[in-house]
Regions:
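Long, hydrophobic alpha-helical transmembrane bundles and adjoining juxtamembrane helices/loops
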Residues: 3, 25, 38-65, 74-77, ...
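Cleavable N-terminal signal peptides of Sec/SRP-targeted secreted and luminal proteins
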Residues: 3-21
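Surface-exposed beta-strand/loop patches in noncatalytic accessory domains
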Residues: 25-72, 96-147, 163-193, 216-259, ...
Length: 824
């Protein structure tokens, strides 16, 4: 009897509750006509009854419903796989609820045959910013491999529920996206927000093997562009977009080159996601209070175009090699034309009296104004006329061992005599043995060759690892390419930027060959006319020239390694050998007229290593304190080098230096106002003024790119020294040969054009990856090279011509006596 009563009560309650649910739905959404089925659990107690409202929904219809702790709503979309949907169509679901809370959100679960998708409203991104309206595109099952949906009835179930005690209203809709596919060479516009990501499908047309996809926007709101395989699920939220495919952050523009061979179905998804903040794109972030997020809607345009064919790769490669091969042809022609105009034949034309003149006579004349010397020193230092026997107890100057001049007490006195004369000539600073000096300068290129091997191998290993990480993770923010002109080949993502450094290598090798040819001619000259050659022209030592050629080759290798994956972590690979080139050029200019007192190789390379170390510290830890310390060190080093150059190495730093300076100031106060070596003093005064200005500017302005700032200092000093050397050469009555003048003018043109392309700023590693991409530009040469690649070509030519200037600048002095060639 009791059981019968309970069954009757259950039926009554079921009918009553169903009528209440229908009345509520008709009240909330009276304008929508849909089929409703209500189900109640028959086993629970009355207070725990749970109601499920099933709605047979239609696409394009908006539903306004309520949910609470005791109810849920299931929207069912039934369709035919052939008639209703196809590969060009996708379904997009939108849910909004302004009354939902973080503690009791509206939960949305979408069930499809291939998987499920779920989210909550409000949607909290980064656990801070709340979005009360969410739109998601469902993964199209028709795009999946091995899909058997043709001629089959399909259904999509959307469950909406909430754990809120009070009724929570929400709005729900699902619509078809008929233009889901991106078309080739057609612009497509889209609107994206953090809670409303978008993605579209692109399918490679026939005969198209690679495409470049460009995304542009006028807004700088930060977003992510992701390329993913055709598979479910599609990762279209900020928290999971990094889990699949490749991606870039974007502010105003992004670009990706994609190859059909990397995708099974020759198709992919382009996923657009707006980030809740701009830190990843702009490097700064405006602080916002937690809670409702501000509007971050971004309008973007998407364009897909075909990339260059493989034939264009061959054109770009062979054009570059052919261009630099022209320099080899020109060099060969010039060498053939000047084959009969070498120095050895010209020396034969010098009269016997001019060749046999006693150099001690000119030495005494040139030093008479400074003070007298004993006759023994004059005899000791006078060379022997060819064919004449060497007097007993006397040694020829060219047979003096270097240790005799460097360590003996008498030799130190000779240094003080010769190097402190008011009028110095090259003969005064070319007294060491030619054989010993040649060995000393050979150390430069052998040491640099060793440094290049030990420095280059780890660099190559590191950048290859970067390239592998880029491919494995898909994070294209790792490398700062010009994505609008990045042509991959093999394992390299940007082959053109790597290959464009071929000019440094080819021209560096050519310069080494030219130096070797000149060195061979000089060795032949020494063998045939050694006594004559020793007294004429600038002393020829080619070790620094070989080192310059090796440095140019290594600049190409290191720059190529850097451009495998250019970023903040490996910038020094591209600049380290530029510092070395600048230092070697300055050392070579100084060595030309100071062959006996140039810096030793290990000292020079140690200083260059300290410069590179300082560049790294300046980029990583460029604080205000660092800039102050750097400015002080810069000015102090400038003074030390000035003293070393001014006194020709005849001074030393010890604990008595300040005492000596005080005595000089007290005893020769008036003479201090009139420098003894005016030319040197003027050069050093101008050089110190410029370097101090650089140091003060750095301490005050604190440039963001310390590496470029430091390189500018070295280049500025090198240009200043070259200009001074040429001016002093002309003021001394010396001439410059026409071929050297032509190369000087040509190098000015090439340097000007090279700097024009250098300042195009296509990328910048001291910005964020998205900020760097704002400067990306299309290719400008052969549809293969961008402006920075042209900079590589032009700067390689400019450096090569600059090296030739140093090699040929003093050729007019080959027939001039060394005791008549002034030192400056």
């Amino acid at each position: 009897m009791v059981v019968s009563v309970l069954r009757v009560l259950s039926v009554v309650l079921f009918i009553g509750t169903a009528s209440q649910g229908s009345s509520a739905n008709n009240t909330l959404d009276g304008e929508v006509d849909h089929h409703v089925r209500t189900v109640i659990s028959p086993y629970g107690e009355l207070k725990n009854d749970f109601q499920t409202l099933v709605v047979e929904a239609e696409f394009g219809t908006t539903y306004r419903e309520i949910v609470d702790l005791k109810s849920e709503i299931v929207f069912v979309y039934s369709f035919n796989g052939t008639k209703d949907l196809n590969e060009m169509t996708a379904v997009r679901v939108s849910v909004s609820s302004v009354n939902s809370t973080r503690s009791s959100p509206v939960m949305v679960v979408v069930r499809q045959r291939e998987g499920i998708m779920s989210w909550a409203v409000p949607l909290f991104i980064d656990y801070i910013y709340a979005y009360y309206s969410v739109s998601r595109t469902l993964c199209p099952i028709f795009h999946l491999p091995d899909s058997d949906t043709e001629d089959a009835e399909e259904a999509i179930y959307v469950d909406v529920s909430s754990m809120a005690v009070n009724a929570t209203p929400f709005t729900f809709s699902a619509e078809l996206l008929p233009n889901f596919e991106l078309r080739h060479n057609e612009m497509k516009n889209a609107t994206v927000s953090p809670s409303e990501p978008q993605y579209f499908m692109y399918k490679f047309p026939e005969n198209v093997t690679s495409v470049l996809i460009k995304v542009n926007s006028d807004s700088k709101t930060c977003m992510v562009v992701s390329i993913q395989e055709i598979r479910c699920p599609v990762y279209d939220l900020d928290r999971n977009v990094e889990f699949a495919g490749k991606y870039q952050t974007m502010s105003t523009q992004a670009a990706m080159l994609l190859q059909a061979s990397n995708y099974e179905r020759r198709a992919f998804y382009v996923v657009l996601i707006v980030k809740p903040f701009d830190l990843d794109c702009l490097g700064i972030e405006e602080i916002q209070t937690s809670g409702a997020a501000i509007s971050r809607v971004k309008n973007v345009s998407i364009f897909v175009e075909e990339t260059i064919p493989k034939s264009q790769y061959f054109k770009g490669i062979f054009a570059a090699v052919g261009f630099f091969s022209i320099f080899y042809v020109i060099a060969l022609v010039v060498l053939c034309c000047f084959h009969r105009c070498n120095t050895s034949q010209s020396l034969m034309d010098i009269s016997e009296s001019e060749r046999d003149i006693d150099s001690s006579h000119s030495f005494v004349q040139s030093s008479a104004s400074y003070g007298s010397m004993s006759s023994n020193i004059g005899k000791e230092m006078s060379p022997v006329v060819p064919g004449q026997a060497t007097p007993p107890g006397h040694r020829r100057v060219d047979s003096l061992d270097e240790s005799d001049l460097d360590f003996l007490h008498d030799a130190n006195e000779e240094k003080d005599i010769f190097r402190t004369k008011t009028a110095l000539f090259v003969s005064d600073l070319a007294r060491k043995s030619r054989k010993k000096l040649s060995k000393l300068y050979k150390v430069y290129h052998w040491n640099l060759f060793t440094i290049a091997i030990f420095y280059g191998l780890p660099v190559a290993q590191l950048v290859i690892t970067y390239q592998k990480v880029l491919v494995a993770t898909g994070n294209e923010d790792l490398c700062y390419y010009n994505f609008d002109c990045a042509h991959p080949l093999g394992v390299l993502s940007c082959f053109n930027s790597v290959f464009s450094n071929i000019g440094y290598v080819l021209l560096g090798i050519l310069f080494i060959l030219l130096v070797w040819h000149r060195d061979s001619l000089h060795k032949k000259l020494v063998r045939e006319h050694g006594d004559v050659e020793q007294r004429f022209g600038i002393p020829q030592h080619f070790g620094l020239f070989y080192a310059m050629g090796i440095a140019l080759v290594m600049e190409g290798v290191m720059s190529a390694c850097y451009h495998v994956c250019p970023n903040y972590s490996n910038f020094q690979f591209d600049t380290s050998f530029m510092y070395i080139i600048a230092c070697l050029c300055m050392l070579k200019i100084y060595q030309s007229r100071h062959p006996d007192i140039n810096a030793k190789a290990y000292q020079a390379y140690l200083c260059m290593a300290l410069v590179i170390f300082m560049a790294v510290i300046g980029v990583v830890y460029a604080t205000g304190l660092f800039w102050i310390i750097y400015a002080i060190v810069h000015m102090f080093v400038s003074l030390l080098l000035s003293a070393q150059i001014y006194y020709m190495g005849r001074w030393q730093i010890d604990r008595y230096i300040f005492k000596r300076l005080w005595y000089v100031f007290v005893t020769d106060c008036l003479k201090c106002a009139r420098p003894t070596y005016r030319d040197r003093f003027f050069l050093l005064l101008v050089g110190n003024a410029i370097n101090w200005a650089f140091a003060i500017y750095g301490a005050v302005q604190q440039p963001t790119d310390f590496a470029s700032y430091l390189l500018a200092i070295f280049i500025g000093n090198l240009l200043l020294y070259c200009l001074f050397y040429i001016l002093m050469k002309l003021l001394s009555g010396e001439k410059i040969k026409w071929i050297a003048i032509f190369i000087i003018l040509l190098s000015m043109v090439t340097w000007g054009s090279a700097l024009f392309f250098f300042f195009s700023h296509l990328t910048s590693w001291h910005k964020t990856p998205a900020g760097s991409r704002e400067g990306n530009r299309p290719c400008i040469l052969l549809e293969f090279y961008d402006a920075h690649d042209v900079w590589h070509f032009m700067s390689a030519v400019s450096l090569f011509l600059s090296f030739l200037i140093l090699l040929l600048l003093d050729d007019d002095l080959s027939l001039k006596r060394r005791d008549r060639i002034p030192v400056f």
